[in-house]
Design a protein with these regions (language model features):
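Single conserved hydrophobic/aromatic residue that forms the stacking wall/gate
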Residues: 1-9, 232-238
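Conserved beta-strand hairpin/beta-sheet module of binuclear metal-dependent hydrolase folds
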Residues: 10-62, 155-164, 195-203
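Short Gly/Pro-enriched turn/cap motifs at secondary-structure boundaries
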Residues: 23-25, 117-118, 123-125, 145-149
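Residue-level detector of beta-strand structural context in well-folded domains
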Residues: 33, 126, 131-132, 154-156
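Short catalytic-loop micro-motif centered on adjacent basic/acidic residues
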Residues: 44-46, 68-71, 143-145
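Active-site HxH/HxHxD metal-binding segment of metal-dependent hydrolases
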Residues: 51-135, 139
Length: 238
């Protein structure tokens, strides 16, 4: 029985070829994103937090075809549906090289009090480093390694100009409309000028509304995460 907000559902078109479904899942109310290519219906799943049946149901009812599972970091509340989705779709599991061992640590994952179905180790298929890319057809996801919440926390950036589907006058402001206080998606560019929104970043728990994820959990480092917020950012992130 889910103790989270598995019925929270939001679907949005961000560009001519990029759509996103957000689900809030599990006891920790974790954001899970299904990013899909509007032209092909191919999709990937970011942070399969919990409630695998809810994720599978949303994929099915929207006619989507999963290609990858991306994990921003290896904390329990972001991966409890990982095994079920891997078994269902037999698709690559993608995580940073640094955080990959966490997916194998059943004891650490299962010690959290909200785990109802014991987690079983999942071996990742793709190990990422800074700047590595994952492509969903013509949509490019660039990896950003952002230590602090965990040593290998990753964010995934979509640069609109490097995807072939450019925004039109009809939907150019939907990215700005989509950003809200409950998301862990952040835009690149000026949120007050929709034409200047250059892309979006899926941040996991590295960046939250009004702050950042805990650094008191295993692998957290306050100094590392403070550097992310105090160092000049060439990425024009808002």
């Amino acid at each position: 029985v889910s103790r989270g907000l598995g019925d929270v559902y939001k679907r949005q078109v961000l560009s001519d070829n990029i759509g996103i479904i957000r689900l809030v899942l599990g006891a920790c109310f974790t954001n899970c994103y299904i990013v899909y290519n509007i032209r092909t219906n191919n999709c990937l799943i970011i942070d399969p937090a919990d409630d695998a049946e809810k994720i599978i149901d949303n994929i099915s009812k929207n006619g989507l075809k999963p290609q990858y599972i991306l994990v921003t970091h290896g904390h329990t509340d972001h991966i409890l549906a990982l095994g079920a989705l891997k078994e269902k779709y037999n698709i690559p599991v993608v995580i940073s090289r640094i955080d990959a061992p966490r997916l194998l640590d059943e004891e650490l994952i299962n010690e959290r009090p909200y785990v109802e179905v014991p987690y079983k180790a999942v071996y990742p298929s793709v190990l990422l480093g800074e700047g590595d890319e994952i492509w969903l057809d013509d949509i490019r996801f660039e990896t950003m390694i952002l230590p602090g919440h965990t040593p290998g926390s990753a964010a995934f950036k979509i640069d609109f100009k490097n995807s072939t589907g450019h925004r039109t006058d009809e939907n150019k402001d939907t990215a700005a409309q989509y950003m809200d206080a409950e998301n862990t998606i952040y835009q690149v560019g000026d949120s007050n000028e929709p034409d200047n929104i250059k892309g979006i970043i899926f941040t996991g728990d590295t960046m939250l509304a009004g702050g950042h994820g805990k650094t008191s959990l295993p692998g957290g480092n306050e100094e590392d995460i403070c550097l992310l917020y105090t160092s000049p950012s060439p990425r024009d992130t808002r």
